[in-house]
Amino acid sequence: MADERPLVKPLEMSRYCVPFSPFRGRVEEAIVCLVSTAGVRLGSDAPFRAEGDTTYRIIPGEASGADLAFDDTHYDHACAERDVNCIFPIDRLRELAQEKRIGGLTDRHFSMGFTQALRELRETTVPMLAREVDRARPDAVLLTGG
């Protein structure tokens, strides 16, 4: 009898992803930008829509972990509720900058929430976000998820 299971199409976005880009500079001199998909935002900003949201939020470089909230309901929040730095390590990076282990932080960072609207994400959100990150002039970008 023939296998009647439906063929599963691979994740549409996978052929566009580049998971790694080697860093060739000196980490001690690198200005770092944070980009997260964990739904992190300033507590005063509009929440991400938990059912799906293709927008992103800008987080000022001077923000601390205490200023942040997160909305994505698609991962376990146990650790993040104790310390948001496990999903958006802004305080830890600031400590590394004070210790001269990195060059510093950009004046703004970025976060997105959950979405399955991959075409809109790929064609609209990601290009806009990439331009924003480029304008922040980082030497390195740290990507985090939830």
Which stretches of residues belong to each language-model region?
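An N-terminal assembly and electron-transfer interface module characteristic of large anaerobic redox
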Residues: M1-G146
